[in-house]
């Protein structure tokens, strides 16, 4: 026999006497000992834990820079058993299916309005959603994206490990595979990109009977009358498209809707939804959810202002009370990485954690926008800094976003409240106005919540601090203005831009009334 030292462990070679044992050790070396580390080198230059948008963007850019890369991804089923493929929240249970459901709701409205435009619709009463057909179409699209993503990793020669990764030490990760087997690997650098999952309130029946945004897009039966607990953008978007599809929706609001967004615009969103039939229960917290013999759910809640309890029966209860980072399953203490206890989020100002070679991108970051494009760009820039010699940092300011409620809300920059807090009310000017989308005229749609404003510095040339827009296709409207904000656009430049007529986006170029003036912000004419 002879000996060999690997990773500081002395191994006895028994080839003379036990050849079969030696063959087994060689064939199953990773399972027995983990990867070989020789002369301080590692199997991979980068291991990315998490196969969502940010992690994948980082991995692909690292490969482009010549790095050896592995991606570990595993989806723990939701409490209701929902699971999905590679691609993260956005592709599977977030942006993509949400936008498709939103589009389905808008199409239903358009069919009803088509009569006003001269289309002959056989029977408006017959216009209703086929929920199984919708979810099947949505899921088929998602599966196609899962497949394309997997093939892309293969073509780029990124090692994909479909296992739940956790740290053993700062450079070593073990992945637990679906069949329970283990695979170890070492990496010089690690990126944590595991994202987050919906939070469930600690009340009776929440875990057992309620669904979340993880489940709604593949729900096997029509949701029926639905209670949405939570009034963040996820809750309002879900309540909005469900109600528009003909499923009555109610929303429990604990404090304010769309916390963190401009509150004047948030009120317009909820006003519009109420006028469309969504019920809002303000200042309320859930108490319990009970399953009845009929299969329906009895929900109880308390109004914190009146201290009165209320209850109602629903077919579905959807929890949208926030999200937590999936870092607890990573065994971060073994790597020395610190995180925020309550949320599990990682503090990393430049995506670098307190352990120099371990980074984080996406929804796991404390104090950063939980948005797919943010994670993608941050991941890409991080890979360029790690392997391409770049020094460019992610700019988290002036990130545009849109809430896809029935009447959409797009925003970029500061809310009016934050602008006043930072600069003082006397140093802020707010230009605002209502407008009438041309396509709303003939079907006589409600226009009283179609509104926009520009929050600027008061001193010339009045640099724009924030732009806010409630109306149709808000995301398409606000995207171009995000680039202008990046370039430091002023109010003078905005109003001297020639608009495209007739569009809703041109309304920003027509802003000329300030809140301070007290003048009527309603439009007098569409063409002057």
Where do the model's predicted regions map?
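AMP-binding/adenylate-forming core of the ANL superfamily
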Residues: 190, 315-319, 358-359, 363, ...
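Flexible, glycine-rich terminal cap/loop adjacent to redox cofactors
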Residues: 49-54, 58-84, 96, 100-106, ...
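Rossmann-like NAD(P)H-binding beta-loop-alpha module
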Residues: 220-256, 260-261
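Beta1/beta-strand and adjacent pyrophosphate-binding region of the FAD-binding site
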Residues: 40-52, 224-229
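Glycine-rich beta-alpha-beta "Rossmann" dinucleotide-binding loop(s) and their flanking helix/strand
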Residues: 194-215, 302-346, 364
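A conserved FAD-binding loop/helix module that cradles the flavin
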Residues: 361-418, 505-512, 516-523
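Short, small-residue-biased leader/transition segments that mark boundaries at the very start
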Residues: 1-2
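Glycine-rich flavin
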Residues: 18-44, 60-222, 253-259, 263-265, ...
């Amino acid at each position: 026999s002879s000996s060999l030292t690997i990773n500081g462990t002395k191994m006895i070679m028994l080839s003379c006497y036990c050849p079969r044992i030696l063959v087994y050790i060689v064939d199953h070396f990773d399972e027995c000992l983990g990867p070989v580390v020789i002369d301080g080198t590692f199997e991979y230059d980068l291991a990315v834990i998490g196969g969502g948008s940010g992690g994948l963007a980082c991995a692909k850019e690292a490969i482009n820079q010549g790095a050896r890369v592995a991606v570990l991804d595993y989806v723990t089923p939701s409490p209701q058993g929902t699971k999905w493929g590679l691609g993260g929240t956005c592709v599977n249970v977030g942006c993509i299916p949400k936008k498709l459901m939103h589009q389905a709701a808008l199409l239903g409205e358009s069919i009803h309005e088509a009569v006003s435009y001269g289309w002959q619709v056989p029977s408006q009463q017959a216009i209703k959603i086929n929920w199984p057909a919708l979810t099947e179409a949505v899921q088929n699209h998602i599966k196609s994206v899962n497949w394309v993503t997997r093939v892309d990793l293969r073509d780029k020669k990124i090692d994909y490990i479909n296992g739940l990764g956790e740290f053993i030490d700062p450079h070593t990760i073990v992945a637990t595979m679906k069949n329970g087997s283990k695979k170890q690997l070492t990496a010089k650098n690690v990126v944590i990109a595991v994202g987050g999952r919906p939070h469930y309130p600690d009340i009776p029946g929440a875990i057992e009977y309620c669904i979340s945004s993880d489940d709604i897009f593949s729900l096997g039966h029509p949701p029926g009358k639905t209670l949405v607990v939570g009034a963040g953008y996820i809750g309002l978007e879900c309540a909005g498209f469900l109600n528009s599809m003909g499923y009555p929706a109610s929303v429990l609001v604990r404090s304010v809707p769309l916390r963190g967004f401009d509150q004047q615009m948030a009120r317009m969103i909820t006003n519009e939804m109420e006028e469309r039939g969504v019920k809002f229960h303000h200042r309320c917290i859930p108490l319990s959810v009970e399953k009845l013999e009929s299969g329906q759910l009895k929900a109880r809640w308390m109004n914190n202002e009146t201290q009165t309890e209320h209850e109602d029966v629903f077919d579905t209860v959807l929890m949208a009370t926030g999200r937590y980072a999936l870092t607890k399953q990573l065994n971060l203490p073994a790597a020395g990485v610190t995180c925020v206890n309550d949320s599990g989020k990682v503090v990393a100002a430049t995506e670098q954690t307190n352990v120099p070679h371990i980074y984080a991108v996406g929804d796991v970051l404390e104090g950063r926008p939980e948005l797919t494009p943010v994670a993608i760009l941050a991941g890409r820039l991080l890979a360029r800094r790690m392997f391409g010699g770049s020094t460019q940092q992610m700019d988290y300011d002036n990130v545009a976003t849109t809430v896809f409620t029935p009447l959409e809300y797009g925003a970029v920059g500061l809310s009016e409240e934050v602008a006043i807090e930072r600069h003082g009310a006397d140093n802020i000017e707010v230009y605002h106005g209502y407008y009438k989308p041309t396509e709303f005229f003939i079907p006589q749609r409600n226009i009283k919540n179609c509104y926009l404003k520009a929050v600027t510095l008061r001193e010339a040339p009045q640099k724009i601090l924030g732009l806010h827009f409630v109306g149709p296709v808000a995301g398409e409207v606000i995207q171009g203005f995000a680039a202008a904000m990046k370039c430091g656009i002023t109010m003078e430049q905005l109003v001297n831009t020639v608009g495209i007529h007739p569009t809703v986006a041109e309304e920003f170029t027509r802003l000329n009334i300030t809140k301070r003036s007290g003048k009527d912000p309603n439009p007098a004419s569409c063409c002057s």
